[in-house]
């Protein structure tokens, strides 16, 4: 579960290393976000040659959470970290590579480009 002020790793090659959640999109009083949800985030750490500079406010989709995900078949899945992929205004990923596994729930949310770039979908 991701909420305001949660820090997430960035799982793409935009050059940003860490983002902080500012707002969870999808309702006026929505507090928590899970895998596949879009958030508004601020870039907190970035490399000097990054496409996205430190301090920039961006949209991102969550691809991994440390909080377990309950699936319809009764199984649970959780990851070691919280991670997101930075999006542009058209909800397409800015980066051209995705690092690490991503959850299958990202596909159900309609981010097929991210799923096709990912090395592993769990």
From Swiss-Prot:
Keywords annotated in UniProt: Ribonucleoprotein, Ribosomal protein, RNA-binding, rRNA-binding
Gene Ontology CC annotations of this record: cytosolic large ribosomal subunit
GO molecular function: large ribosomal subunit rRNA binding; structural constituent of ribosome
Gene3D superfamilies reported in the protein's UniProt record: Ribosomal protein L14
Biological process according to GO: translation
Pfam families tied to this protein: Ribosomal_L14
Keyword rRNA processing in annotation: no
Record HAMAP family: Ribosomal_uL14 (MF_01367)
Function in brief: Binds to 23S rRNA. Forms part of two intersubunit bridges in the 70S ribosome.
Family of the protein in this entry: Belongs to the universal ribosomal protein uL14 family.
Record text on subunit structure and interactions: Part of the 50S ribosomal subunit. Forms a cluster with proteins L3 and L19. In the 70S ribosome, L14 and L19 interact and together make contacts with the 16S rRNA in bridges B5 and B8.
Protein's name in the database: Large ribosomal subunit protein uL14
